[in-house]
Amino acid sequence: MNRFSLAVALLAALPVWAQSQRPPYQTTKVEGTDNVYVFRAGGHQSMFVVTKDGVIATDPIGYGRPQMVKTYVEEIRKVTDKPIKYLVYSHHHNDHISGAKPFKDAGATIVAHRRARDRILAQNDPEMVPTDEVFSKQRTLRLGGTAVELTYVGLNHSDSTIVMRLPKEKIMFAVDFLPVGQVPGRGMIDFYPLEVEGSIKQVLAMDWERLIPGHPGPGDRLGTKQDAQDQLDFLRYASETVKAAAREGKCWDQAEKEVKLPKYEKWPGYENGLPLVIRRYCGIWGRGT
């Protein structure tokens, strides 16, 4: 065996996780733009937009890793010395919005849906910095010639989730309720499983071409409208399949063991995530809702 063959064999012998290790954080410019960036920390990611007058950033993603928020700010500083004007919360869940103090210290105005403000105040968590400004249905942030449209699209993964669209760049940032090319899995635990379909349809009706999800998709790729449609089709199919099982009295345990969605078995997260999807829909159809 020559040295090259030996090296290949040794690499192949490594466990998958060792081959796929990646740095704990990464900042990437969105291809085809000169001002839109994705900051990834572990399994979470956020978007920030650089303009001639300042920066619009999203979700600090500091839950369990407060130092990473400082890193996020430092990564922005590597790109631009312009002030961070806004920090936008996608929704109120702490895994996405904990740790915003470094942004607040940098002078950012924190914007979110009004329900996010109410939820944050009710939780009284010192790591969740309260909002400065809120809105109910829609708001557009305009800074340095760039517009970011913030839209509340109803109940989905939470009751406070907004999506953020860059009309010029045709980019959408949507968190948790629109995973790219994968089974939602444990994210279904607190889904509004019927209402989320309406949210996705609203997003599909908007003008955009690329989707930045709040959790990296397979290969860290950005999503497309086809990905959004595929997710909607998956949820509808899962809902109808579990409804049929519920009518046969199979919810909960039997349905989790027996219900399969072979069309989606190649999606990442299928094996571990499908039982959680079934459980959530059993919570609807198995109770006669």
How should these model regions be labeled?
Residues 9-18:
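Hydrophobic h-region of N-terminal signal peptides that target proteins for export
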